[in-house]
Amino acid sequence: MTYQAPDENGFYGKFGGRFVPETLMKAVIELDEAYRASKTDSAFQKELNYYLKEYVGRETPLYFAEQLTAHAGGAKIYLKREDLNHTGAHKINNTIGQALLARQMGKHKVVAETGAGQHGVATATVAALFNMECTIFMGEEDVKRQSLNVFRMELLGAKVVSVKAGSRTLKDAVNEALRFWVANVEDTHYIMGSVLGPHPFPEIVRDYQSVIGIEARKQHMEKEGKLPEAIVACVGGGSNAMGLFYPFVDDSSVQMHGVEAAGHGLETEFHAATISKGEIGILHGAMMDVLQDENGQILEAFSISAGLDYPGIGPEHSFFRDLGRAEYHSVTDDEAVEAFQLLCRTEGIIPALESSHAISYAVKLASKMRPEESMVVCLSGRGDKDVNQLKERLEEQAND
């Protein structure tokens, strides 16, 4: 059976949809129409591919991690090197596409939210490239954690607004960015950073990120003469995972594994494991699994990795879970830090803390598989942004 989702109302099973105030409905429908038109517009697609190749540096390598494989002692581990993109992560695959879409709609201003700062940097980058005015909302906590990325965004010409409401993290930044969009909808496009939000955002972001899986599928066939037995990616909102998963969705022999942030542990309140611990609710314009208390109040998500501490998850991931098409697991802060150090030492690659969650689970999974089997892990970003945070953490532990 060929997988087809979302339906015409933007639902993935019972998840997704379009729950937005009347003030945004026109903009969301306009975006939907522009997006559908762009898919069959050969000039648009040609320009998108030009920038992905010449500016972003695609395609990215599928790298056989020989030493990591030997360490795990099982299946071959291939890394899809999204860390080698311009700006150092997968985020730019999506921002390039959406900036071109904004231009097509005649909008010369963009707004975005950011957690780790990677999406903010990728948005500020394309805004500079296409000469657009750019406003980025970032939770005050994340501004502190990722001060280097704040400076990067400002260097690129963006205005960074520190959000002091609520938990002062990603969820609150999204709230403020949506408010800003409502007030400036005529000339501003909202560049959603993950497979979240009202329809058509989850579909748009999935499609722009699918370049990851399309390339990985082709590259793995060239290297191994077969499809991988498993594919693994970290999941916050879930765009790098969806980008890897979607092109494999009809290949039933390929197991799909999403890895959430377990923070201090699932038994504590300090985690971001939405699929494991969430319940269905509406957040930021879509029906999805959400971390919430018994009164339906959104809980704060927690992770060492600023890019994973979102209290919801892309609706299509929840749908994959319900279909049994993908499995979701979680990895603690400590396990992610261990995997971060392991990849540095075995392969000479400094991964983002987000991606380190995927590496941690991949090593466990590979050890249970046979040597003739193989897997693809999405190395979603590089870890330069995390080195300082890690240094402080390890120094604290040494002093305890």
Swiss-Prot record:
It is an enzyme of class 4 (lyase). One of its GO terms (molecular function) is tryptophan synthase activity. PANTHER family: TRYPTOPHAN SYNTHASE, TRYPTOPHAN SYNTHASE-RELATED. It catalyses: (1S,2R)-1-C-(indol-3-yl)glycerol 3-phosphate + L-serine = D-glyceraldehyde 3-phosphate + L-tryptophan + H2O. This is Tryptophan synthase beta chain. It comes from Listeria welshimeri serovar 6b (strain ATCC 35897 / DSM 20650 / CCUG 15529 / CIP 8149 / NCTC 11857 / SLCC 5334 / V8). Its cofactor is pyridoxal 5'-phosphate. GO terms for cellular component: cytoplasm. The beta subunit is responsible for the synthesis of L-tryptophan from indole and L-serine. Tetramer of two alpha and two beta chains. Keywords: Amino-acid biosynthesis, Aromatic amino acid biosynthesis, Lyase, Pyridoxal phosphate, Tryptophan biosynthesis. Pathway: Amino-acid biosynthesis; L-tryptophan biosynthesis; L-tryptophan from chorismate: step 5/5. Belongs to the TrpB family. The modification N6-(pyridoxal phosphate)lysine is found at K91. Gene3D superfamilies: 3.40.50.1100. Its EC number is 4.2.1.20.
